[in-house]
Amino acid sequence: MAKIKFEEGIKKLEEIINQLENKEQGLDDALELFQEGVRLYRICNEKLTEAEEKISVMIEEGNQLVERPFEGGEE
């Protein structure tokens, strides 16, 4: 998988969405853009998953801070 920063992937994905919404390309070009968008989505989603696994939440129990794994939910 390509080494791409999350922010760069999101920016490229937004550009692809804008191009697809303009409907100015032919079917073959639109399909190619769609496939690239799916690839970028998967890369960005994987990076988010990796980041969530690294995040810990500090919870105060009594007078101590206890580290707990991040348990984020779907929006």
From Swiss-Prot:
Classification via InterPro entries: Exonuc_VII_S (IPR003761), Exonuc_VII_ssu_sf (IPR037004)
Keywords associated with the record: Cytoplasm, Exonuclease, Hydrolase, Nuclease
EC number from the UniProt entry: 3.1.11.6
Keyword Isomerase attached: no
Cellular component annotations (GO), alphabetically ordered: cytosol; exodeoxyribonuclease VII complex
Record GO biological process: DNA catabolic process
Molecular function GO labels: exodeoxyribonuclease VII activity
Main enzyme class: hydrolase
One Pfam family linked to the record: Exonuc_VII_S
Keyword Hydrolase: yes
Record's subcellular location: Cytoplasm
PANTHER family named among the record's database cross-references: EXODEOXYRIBONUCLEASE 7 SMALL SUBUNIT
UniProt cross-references to NCBIfam families, sorted A to Z: xseB
Subunit structure: Heterooligomer composed of large and small subunits.
This protein's name: Exodeoxyribonuclease 7 small subunit
Native source organism of the sequence: Alkaliphilus metalliredigens (strain QYMF)
Gene name per UniProt: xseB
